């Protein structure tokens, strides 16, 4: 058989024929060809392609291979079969499938004649090790052949031989010398195997070919590669090493890895920083790294060997375990140098991955030795360290003491579940650890809003002063570390780890989001923000307004909660008015700050939604503190018994569907009136400062149009007059002698009844915002805080399609569409949005865009995620329509204002 046409040669100086079918080379062959075409210092290769690779057993190969071995000598400065400076070879199988189980064959050319010359350069011990490594590969092939031929006796003998060789390789017992090993296994090998290096190579290739011949119906297109071996311990000027093309945590464009001087195997060895290698070699390694990055558009892991001054690229592969920061910084670097365009950059990052950039990550070297427990439900990804406290009050007290004493203020709130009264603790905590609920539970939603970490551990038992998980006890005041990655298993560590803090600027997040925003058209993202700080963060992350300002969160601040409680428990209008004036001034300052930060953008203020039940003092400690406050402020107060009686009267069995939202406005009109006055006082104050403000007032938990009509326009019945928003605005405007501003009043659609009567509600609402957390609860009859207790069973029996508090349920989607259609029939220009944590998920965003909503609103920390999801949806839609996606962003610096390729 004439095999010459099926043998090919490649090196960094000699490329393969372009007409050659690359499918015949296998994966490794194609990679070697690709790298050689880049001019990288790859090992030269003889490639026996797939047309003959299974048919070489019995063929004379020496004459066909010898010319190529001489080419190896010219490049490698060593000669095959030379006694003094022998070149050794490896035989590599190159299948077309990435997953294969072929043995690796190294060190051909080690014979009785060449062993001494090789040992003189690398040492007797290492040379002997390489003999055993050669034997391991060959006997692996022989075992495969014996099993294919159903030669049970031969297979058994090879299995025992391989076991013995493995013991020698692992140093389990005193091994024979290299020459003794050649004699020891001589009878099991082809004749002359250790007598003639050319016979050895020829027999090795034949055996590999024979092994492949048994797989005619299996692996398709396996090539055989022959390459020279190079060693990092081959005398002076020899090194080995491994590195990443840039830092895989920070993304800094600097090699990250180690090198080893005069060593071949880096295992169990302490290396030196690769950047400290000789400058000439460092320059070569940098050129290799960044050529690979530009070509693959990925961070690469590179293994190299420098043998007697010559540098060789041994292996390169993508890096799976890298941070999102490193990926983003790589993409931005490629974009600035016009290697990729903005579209490629935006498509290369999954929206959820941005969570990692927005929160701290653990320095994994700092958790060695810490006890840990894996598992749990992701509330908010990231990492948090802090001392554990089991009530909001105990956490706040510990935080205050630590702050005053200049000590570590990091705290983690650990409770079964959290409620509105716990928000003040979440705000100062670094994270929340709970055992009820999941992604959409109150603890997770609030933590997300404040940029905190949240982990739910259903298997954790929480007591009054301790928690137990996986047999580990967490006492109050103990340090723990929460590691909640975007992908992979969450981990709870006992003790404090070191954290790497995020920086939106240096991480590249701000620049990345600017590129993504270039693809965003009319559909946009707003933020849920309750303070000027939240508003600033929202703008920094690319929000185009505030879609939800939860005013009840403002009342839970420490200096306000007792004022609000005093208002609730007031016995007469005079007392209540005094408290409301205090609250109005406080809220007015909040609104002023938020409007000022968001000048030029819409700000949606949701009037009080939380039930009064949530503002009541709970537990003996809160009751005592409130009684002390009343005594101090009023000079007199309620008795404990009177207070407990009033608390009982106001307590509700099911507050989520009870006295909340617009229902409070009907029963306590002065509360909403106070809030509306605070809004417009802030608006007209800013008007005098020449600052543009676009206020939107949203009424929550609307059930029918009559509720909204009364709140907006007021109502008079015999003996009663209800003042509407319009009348209050006019009152404030006239008192301040201001010019009327445009404002909108809208309804939060979070009940099926509201969705179905949207046409009637739209007569009085200029916008709808779909509150999908409550709409999901009221549509499906599910509690978001309790769903996870039975969700595993429902998932096991395939009774639900995923988590409806993460991905919108089909029936909730239908209600949204019905409400949109009916609302637009009544008011064609009605503005439509969705607020809540559903708004940051790609699947939900695509739905909102498809059905024609105008925006989504989510926590400030979710804004970049939502923007990226929108940009990717716009790109995908353009591709489906066969057009180039419209992009209105900044071109790379190199392009001088032109759009990058």
UniProtKB/Swiss-Prot annotation:
Residues annotated with Phosphoserine modification: 440
EC number: 2.7.9.1
Region span, Disordered: 879-901
CC cofactor: Mg(2+)
Annotated substrate binding sites: 550, 606, 750, 771-774
Region (Linker 2) residue spans: 483-522
Chain positions covered by the region annotation Linker 1: 322-380
Stretches the record annotates as N-terminal: 1-321
Chain positions covered by the region annotation C-terminal: 523-901
Regulation of its function: Activated by light-induced dephosphorylation. Inhibited by dark-induced phosphorylation. Both reactions are catalyzed by PDRP1.
PTM field: Phosphorylation of Ser-440 in the dark inactivates the enzyme. Dephosphorylation upon light stimulation reactivates the enzyme.
One Gene Ontology MF term: ATP binding
Reactions the enzyme catalyzes: pyruvate + phosphate + ATP = phosphoenolpyruvate + AMP + diphosphate + H(+)
Keywords, ordered alphabetically: ATP-binding, Kinase, Magnesium, Metal-binding, Nucleotide-binding, Phosphoprotein, Transferase
Residues binding Mg(2+): 750, 774
InterPro entries membership: ATP_grasp_subdomain_1, PEP-util_enz_mobile_dom, PEP_util_AS, PEP_util_C, PEP_util_CS, Phosphohistidine_dom_sf, Pyruvate_phosphate_dikinase, Pyrv/PenolPyrv_kinase-like_dom
UniProt-annotated catalytic positions: 442, 835
Note: The reaction takes place in three steps, each mediated by a carrier histidine residue located on the surface of the central domain. The two first partial reactions are catalyzed at an active site located on the N-terminal domain, and the third partial reaction is catalyzed at an active site located on the C-terminal domain. For catalytic turnover, the central domain swivels from the concave surface of the N-terminal domain to that of the C-terminal domain.
Primary role: Catalyzes the reversible phosphorylation of pyruvate and phosphate.
Domain observations: The N-terminal domain contains the ATP/Pi active site, the central domain the pyrophosphate/phosphate carrier histidine, and the C-terminal domain the pyruvate active site.
Protein name (database record): Pyruvate, phosphate dikinase
Species annotation: Treponema pallidum (strain Nichols)
């Amino acid at each position: 058989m004439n095999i010459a046409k099926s043998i090919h040669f490649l090196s960094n100086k000699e490329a393969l024929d372009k007409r050659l079918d690359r499918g015949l080379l296998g994966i490794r062959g194609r990679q070697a060809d690709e790298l050689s075409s880049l001019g990288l210092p790859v090992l030269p290769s003889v490639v026996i392609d797939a047309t003959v690779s299974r048919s070489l057993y019995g063929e004379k190969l020496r004459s066909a291979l010898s010319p190529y071995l001489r080419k190896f000598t010219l490049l490698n400065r060593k000669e095959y079969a030379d006694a003094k400076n022998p070149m050794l070879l490896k035989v590599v199988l190159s299948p077309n499938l990435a997953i294969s189980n072929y043995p690796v064959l190294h060190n051909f050319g080690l014979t009785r004649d060449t062993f001494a010359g090789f040992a003189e350069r690398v040492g007797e011990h290492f040379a002997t090790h390489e003999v055993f490594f050669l034997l391991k590969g060959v006997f692996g092939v022989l075992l495969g052949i014996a099993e294919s031929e159903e030669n049970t006796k031969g297979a058994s003998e090879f299995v025992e031989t391989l076991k013995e060789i493995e013991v020698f390789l692992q140093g389990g017992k005193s091994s024979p010398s290299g020459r003794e090993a050649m004699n020891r296994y001589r009878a099991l090998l082809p004749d002359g195997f250790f007598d003639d290096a050319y016979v050895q190579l020829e027999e090795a290739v034949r055996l590999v070919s024979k092994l492949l011949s048994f797989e005619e119906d299996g692996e398709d297109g396996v090539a055989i590669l022959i390459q020279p071996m190079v060693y990092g311990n081959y005398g002076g000027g020899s090194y080995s090493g491994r590195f990443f093309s840039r830092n895989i945590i920070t993304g800094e464009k600097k090699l990250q890895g180690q090198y080893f001087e005069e060593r071949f195997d880096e295992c169990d060895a302490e290396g030196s920083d690769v950047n400290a290698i000789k400058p000439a070699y460092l320059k070569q390694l940098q050129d290799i790294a960044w050529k690979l990055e530009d070509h693959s558009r990925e961070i690469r892991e590179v293994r190299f060997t420098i043998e007697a001054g010559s540098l060789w690229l041994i292996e390169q592969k993508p890096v799976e375990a890298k941070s999102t920061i490193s990926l983003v910084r790589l993409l931005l670097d490629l974009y600035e140098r016009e290697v990729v365009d903005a579209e490629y950059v935006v498509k290369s990052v999954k929206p959820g991955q941005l969570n990692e950039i927005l929160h701290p990550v653990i320095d994994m070297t700092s958790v060695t030795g810490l006890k840990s427990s894996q598992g749990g439900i992701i509330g908010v990804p990231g990492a948090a360290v802090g001392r554990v406290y089991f009530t909001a009050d105990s956490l706040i007290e510990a935080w205050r003491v630590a702050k005053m004493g200049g000590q570590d203020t990091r705290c983690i709130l650990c409770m079964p579940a959290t409620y509105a009264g716990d928000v003040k603790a979440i705000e100062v905590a670094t994270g929340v650890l709970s055992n009820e609920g999941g992604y959409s539970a109150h603890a997770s939603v609030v933590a997300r809003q404040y940029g905190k970490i949240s982990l739910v551990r259903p298997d954790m038992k929480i007591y009054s002063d301790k928690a137990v998980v996986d047999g580990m006890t967490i006492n109050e005041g103990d340090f723990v570390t929460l590691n909640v990655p975007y992908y992979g298993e969450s981990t709870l560590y006992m003790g404090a780890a070191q954290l790497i803090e995020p920086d939106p600027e240096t991480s590249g997040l701000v620049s990345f989001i600017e590129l993504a925003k270039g693809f965003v058209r009319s559909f946009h993202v707003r933020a849920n923000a309750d303070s000027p700080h939240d508003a600033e963060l929202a703008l920094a992350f690319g929000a185009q307004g505030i879609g939800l300002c939860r005013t009840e969160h403002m009342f839970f601040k420490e200096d306000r909660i007792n004022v609000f409680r005093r208002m609730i428990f007031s016995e007469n209008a005079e007392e209540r008015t005094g408290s409301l004036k205090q609250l109005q001034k406080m809220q007015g300052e909040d609104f002023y700050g938020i409007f000022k930060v968001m000048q030029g953008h819409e700000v949606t203020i949701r009037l009080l939604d939380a039930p009064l039940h949530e503002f009541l003092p709970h537990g003996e400690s809160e009751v005592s503190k409130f009684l002390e406050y009343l005594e101090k402020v009023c000079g007199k107060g309620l008795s404990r018994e009177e207070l407990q009686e009033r608390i009982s009267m106001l307590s509700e069995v099911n507050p989520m569907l009870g006295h909340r939202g617009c229902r409070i406005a009907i029963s306590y009109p002065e509360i909403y009136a106070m809030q509306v006055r605070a809004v417009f006082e802030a608006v007209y104050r800013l008007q005098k400062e020449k600052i543009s403000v676009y206020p939107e007032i949203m009424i929550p938990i609307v059930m029918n149009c009559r509720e909204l009509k009364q709140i907006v326009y007021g109502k008079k019945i015999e003996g009663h007059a209800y003042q509407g928003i319009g009348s209050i605005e006019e009152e404030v405007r006239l008192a301040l002698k201001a010019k009327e501003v445009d404002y909108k009043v809208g309804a939060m659609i979070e009940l099926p009844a509201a969705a179905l009567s949207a046409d009637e509600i739209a007569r009085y609402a200029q916008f709808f915002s779909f509150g999908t957390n409550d709409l999901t609860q009221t549509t499906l009859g599910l509690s978001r805080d309790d769903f996870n207790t039975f969700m595993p069973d429902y998932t096991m029996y395939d009774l639900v399609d995923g988590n409806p508090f993460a991905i919108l349920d089909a029936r909730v989607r239908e209600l949204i569409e019905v409400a949109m259609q009916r609302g637009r029939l009544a008011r064609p220009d009605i503005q439509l949005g969705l607020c809540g944590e559903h708004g940051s998920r790609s699947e939900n965003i695509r739905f909102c865009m498809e059905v024609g909503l105008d925006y989504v609103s989510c926590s400030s920390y979710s804004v970049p995620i939502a923007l990226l999801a929108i940009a990717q949806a716009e790109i995908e839609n353009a591709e489906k329509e066969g057009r180039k996606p419209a992009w209105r962003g900044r071109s790379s610096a190199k392009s001088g204002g032109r759009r990058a390729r």
